[in-house]
UniProtKB/Swiss-Prot annotation:
Extent of the signal sequence: 1-20
Keywords, alphabetical: Calcium, Cell adhesion, Extracellular matrix, Glycoprotein, Secreted, Signal
Subcellular location: Secreted, Extracellular space, Extracellular matrix
Protein name: Microfibril-associated glycoprotein 4
One Pfam assignment: Fibrinogen_C
GO cellular component, one term: extracellular space
Keyword Secreted recorded: yes
Biological function: Could be involved in calcium-dependent cell adhesion or intercellular interactions. May contribute to the elastic fiber assembly and/or maintenance.
Main location: secreted
SMART domains in UniProt: FBG
Positions glycosylated per UniProt: 87, 137
Gene3D superfamilies xref list: Gamma Fibrinogen, chain A, domain 1
Lineage: Eukaryota, Metazoa, Chordata, Craniata, Vertebrata
Amino acid sequence: MEALLVLPLLLLLSAGPCAPQLLGIRGDALEKSCLQLPLDCDDIYAQGYQADGVYLIYPSGPSVPVPVFCDMTTEGGKWTVFQKRFNGSVSFFRGWNDYKLGFGRADGEYWLGLQNMHLLTLKQKYELRVDLEDFENNTAFAKYADFSISPNAVSAEEDGYTLYVSGFEDGGAGDSLTYHSGQKFSTFDRDQDLFVQNCAALSSGAFWFRSCHFANLNGFYLGGSHLSYANGINWAQWKGFYYSLKRTEMKIRRA
């Protein structure tokens, strides 16, 4: 499994409570006074770091720094990106443990991890933005005023990291995600959807499948139009089930 790392391991291990924040993928250490460890990109923005790039956040406490890409530009910034795809360099057809803990590199394609996402939404209220781009360079987005992962569960994993979204706002992409609200997350090795077959295997990905999907943003990177049904990076309400998108970002910001 690829670890969800981008910054040098030595820097990660030395990042104590008073360590300077690391700005962008360059790893420039700025001289700052001792700051509270950031939970998310909202905190990082508030601390004065307002450039797009990779930063460290601490959703599970001070001993576990997590690299994350912060979008500080789009619509006022402060977005914590938890899913990013743009070139097919990272396989997203993975098992449960990878999706639970995260994989890829925060300066490239990556998945932040279901447990990290749960811990974030347990502590704050978030909105969600989904940015999409096709191979003809058309862009669209969808926004949701409320986003959370198993907010009331004693054990989020036993609850299946259930998705809750509401308050759709159209940015040209249409609503392909509300259909999935209330569903548990499924991978090919942990089938928790409502279909008699394995939706993750059929869709070549992992998602909050129902039976099966209108959104499949973790599907195969197929490079535009494809003959196979619904197993690419699909957002059905924008491009249907036979078009795999070029770029996707799923990101959250405090509401």
